[in-house]
Amino acid sequence: MAPHNCDRELIDLIHNFFLRSTLLICSSKLNKNQHLLEEIQKFDSDLNEKPDLPKTINEWFHDENERNLPPLVIETLLDLKKLSPNHFVTLRDDDGNVWNVCKGTKKSEIVLERWLIELDNTSAAFQSYRGTIDSTGEIRKQIVLLARYLVTLIQILPSNELEENLTKNSTNLILSLKRKVIDGSKPILSKGRIGLSKPIISTYSNVINERNIPPHLEQRKITPVYTPLGLLRISVSFRHDCRFEVNQSTDSSDNVASNTTNIHQHLEPLHNKNYTNTSLSISPHSHIALASSSERNSIGKKDLNSKPIHPFKTGSVGSCTINQSQAMIRTTSNPSVIATLRAQRSRNDSISCQSQLEDIQLESTSVGSGSKYSSSFGRIRRHSSVKSSENVEKPIRLVKQSNAPTDDLLDFVKMMDEKQELRITKCNISSNNADISNSILRFQKLKSSNEILSEDLSMSVSLEGVNASMHRRSSVSHSPIPSVSPPVQYPSIPSRLSKTNLQEQDTFKTAVVSRRNSVEKSKINISQPKTTGRIENELVDKPLFNEEHESKGEELLASGIIGPSFKRSTSPHSIESVSSLISKTKIAFQQPSYYSHPTTAAVPAYAKLHRPSVLSTDVLSEDQNKKVVQDLNNNKDEDDELLFFMSDMNLSKI
């Protein structure tokens, strides 16, 4: 910090710095005095003689503010107080584009520059300064150098160019530059004026500035001068663009504006009138929008050569006339009448719209494009898109026919109201539609049964040839598994086979073949109750191993009908697959037609059971096994009657 016993000469030098800098900034080009620079250079002269200072800067030279001088702010302003309401201010940028600033009397001034002169004794730069303390003479030399740099900076600022242009152009004397000295320790207000921080050109709002300065501004700083009391600083912030212009509105433009206003005022009642006329067709269910008979007649007799103003260019609403039949339709409350004449009303609208196509061609695009949409709320125009392309060779005759009173049409409406058979027809149609839908549903339900039957037939055909090979393999290996083809859902099979009755065996063959070739018969027979049969063969009692397992295996062979929920995905070569064929109802297994009746012999049975290499557990799902086990438990009582022992059978071919 500066010592207390600071020289008085240093304080006077600092005061003189504030004074001379303020005079340099506030001096204009017209009244530029060369003695200002001379006074700055002669700081070593007698400083005791102070000039008369204005009141705005006199407070910086009091004795109590010798060491703590407040910041001094000088603003360069564009004065707009002389402008009238007919003037408006514009700004031209570097590219020659003109931007509107404000109208006269709206703003009083525009801030162009802001200078800051201060004695900085609190900044870190001053606190950390460790240089040698210069004498008062050295400080004076540095201030003179600073003053020269200040003069150069003032001459290159944009406001200097603006001031020269205003002095050359005598018509712009209403604009002038002025300077204002403000105490920097107090807040600066911009009420009633365009402040320095407000951009006029909107393109600057998209510019990114890394210096934390508004993009429409620039800042310049002069190298400070160090003194024991603080740093003497001068800085300035100014606008890029200062080419302001004043324009005055001419009488011709005022006349054009007044004429435009009169035209808008004249067109408003016309538009309102057209909107009231079109409200008749926009709201078909309203009663207050109906016009009187005289107005309807005047609309019907309107000259076709006249060019009315239509709010809708396509002519679908505004240009269509409304006849008496439409008005009577809206007043009536019978829904059948409205439904009958809705198509007729649409045809009348499209015919009357076509009569004015010649007038609308100059100001409309195409009728077809606008006719896709409804011209009123609550009803659909089904014929407008078709009628718009009809021939328009005789528009006058069509308009007269549409506007003429239609007594025959009213009589036809009354006749249609008296007929009550029309409503019965709708009921018949609805009942027929219901029958058709029910038939379709029934047909769709039959699809699943058809798929099941086709699977049964295909499996029976594919597995029939496997029976012989399976039987031969079982006889050689002494396996208790009999050769049997997978059962098919046949309705009724002879339940008793006798050696003496060969005729029944032939009948069985015929039934099997007929069931394979007929799909419709199998559908009917599936729904019929299935009969159960029991094979009564003469068996020889022999001691067998695993009696319980053999009884279950033979029970599977005895069951011939499978439940409807069963899906044939099992392997025909697996013994586990046979267990899944058990159902509540049981029939005798099918005997191959090319084998003779089975005969029994006293042959000892072997306990060794040959299992197939391929297990069906990989194929069957758990849900199917659960269903089979549940059926076994439920039918335990019935299964006891069908248990029998099976030994090897020697079958001879026919």
Swiss-Prot record:
Keywords from the named record: Autophagy, Cytoplasm, Protein transport, Transport
Primary residence: cytoplasm
Pfam family, one: ATG13
The keyword Transmembrane is annotated on this UniProt entry: no
GO CC field: Atg1/ULK1 kinase complex; cytosol; PAS complex; phagophore assembly site; vacuole-isolation membrane contact site
GO molecular function terms listed in the Swiss-Prot or TrEMBL record: armadillo repeat domain binding; lipid binding; protein kinase regulator activity
InterPro entries the record matches: ATG13, Atg13_N, HORMA_dom_sf
GO biological process: cellular response to nitrogen starvation; Cvt vesicle assembly; mitophagy; piecemeal microautophagy of the nucleus; positive regulation of autophagy; protein localization to phagophore assembly site; protein targeting to vacuole involved in autophagy; regulation of cellular localization
Domain of life per record: Eukaryota
Compartments where located: Cytoplasm; Preautophagosomal structure
Subunit structure: Interacts with ATG1 to form the ATG1-ATG13 kinase complex.
Function: Activates the ATG1 kinase in a nutritional condition dependent manner through the TOR pathway, leading to autophagy. Also involved in cytoplasm to vacuole transport (Cvt) and more specifically in Cvt vesicle formation. Seems to play a role in the switching machinery regulating the conversion between the Cvt pathway and autophagy. Finally, ATG13 is also required for glycogen storage during stationary phase.
Family that this chain belongs to: Belongs to the ATG13 family. Fungi subfamily.
Name this protein carries in UniProt: Autophagy-related protein 13
Annotated organism of origin: Vanderwaltozyma polyspora (strain ATCC 22028 / DSM 70294 / BCRC 21397 / CBS 2163 / NBRC 10782 / NRRL Y-8283 / UCD 57-17) (Kluyveromyces polysporus)
Lineage of origin: Eukaryota, Fungi, Dikarya, Ascomycota, Saccharomycotina
The gene coding this protein: ATG13
